[in-house]
Amino acid sequence: MTSAPDFADWLAVANLKARYCRHLDTKDWSAFASLFAEDVVIDTTAAGGPRMEGRETAVSRIRASLDAATTVHQVHSPEIEIDGNEARAVWAMQDRVAWSNGRKLDGAGHYHERYVRENGEWRIAESRLTRLYVEMQPSD
């Protein structure tokens, strides 16, 4: 059975990931950056993307890639494990991205993540994206 403190942390991690999707899709880059540990590692190589190290580098690259696109990120079915000031989770995900030149992406897969608690706040320390499905429509 999950204890009350663990459940509060579970909810905090789930809310962190919900904010990740919302801030990314609304292009609130300052709020988006605040979700990550300073030394975050974001690895999208399994999905054909880059490996990014450090908050500033990661947010800058994500912003450059998606700032002009309309995006919808959805996560669900979390498997969250809390261990003191660290947590791990696997999230089922789906994303849709549409660029103004007509290029579109529709994808699904999983985020595999590690979180750390810093000064009482949960932050994303590692994120690895794997894809099960990708459909790309080339630009016009």
Question: Where do the language-model regions lie?
Answer:
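Short, low-complexity N-terminal intrinsically disordered segments enriched in polar/charged residues
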Residues: M1-E38
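Short beta-strand edge/turn micro-motifs at domain boundaries
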Residues: R88, A108-P138
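Short, surface-exposed coil-to-beta transition loops
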Residues: H73-V75, D106-Y111
